[in-house]
Swiss-Prot record:
Part of the 50S ribosomal subunit; part of the 5S rRNA/L5/L18/L25 subcomplex. Contacts the 5S and 23S rRNAs. It holds the Pfam family Ribosomal_L18p. The keyword Ribosomal protein applies. InterPro entries: Ribosomal_uL18_bac-type (IPR004389), Ribosomal_uL18_bac/euk (IPR005484). Keywords: Ribonucleoprotein, Ribosomal protein, RNA-binding, rRNA-binding. One of its GO terms (cellular component) is cytosolic large ribosomal subunit. GO terms for biological process: translation. GO terms for molecular function: 5S rRNA binding; structural constituent of ribosome. NCBIfam families: L18_bact. Belongs to the universal ribosomal protein uL18 family. This is Large ribosomal subunit protein uL18.
Length: 123
């Protein structure tokens, strides 16, 4: 998987970091990959089986569960992790590989991981 990403900006650097991480991390049916995508306003977390190329479970701050949520973005990210863990347990998933998507493991990305752990997922 050699992807040429040109540019000097933050988005290009993020894509280069994510490409480096994806060389080493892949999800299987037994241990799928938990992918975290972060924007300025929202968080998206998906559990993906890379062998089948399918998203097994997903949760986001864009979903109906967050229509009346009042709190900080970090609190919302933690709730995303907790709700994702609940959906994953219902689907029979207990362990995952964490893919931070090229972002630093800090703040909202770490909050998603903490929420998933508190919800019962093993990262």
């Amino acid at each position: 998987m050699s992807v040429k990403i040109f540019g000097k900006g933050k988005k290009a650097a993020l894509k280069r970091r994510h490409a480096r991480i994806r060389k080493r991390i892949s999800g299987t049916a037994e241990r799928p990959r938990l992918v975290v995508t972060r924007s300025n306003r929202h968080m998206v977390a998906q559990i993906v089986d890379d062998n089948a190329g399918k998203t097994l479970v997903s949760e986001s701050t864009l979903m109906a569960d967050f229509a009346d949520f009042q709190g900080t973005k970090t609190e919302a990210a933690k709730k995303v992790g907790e709700l994702l863990a609940k959906k994953a347990k219902d689907a029979g998933i207990t362990t995952v590989v964490f893919d931070r998507g090229g972002n630093m493991y800090h703040g909202r990305v770490a909050a998603v991981a903490e929420g998933a752990r508190e919800g019962g997922l093993a990262l």
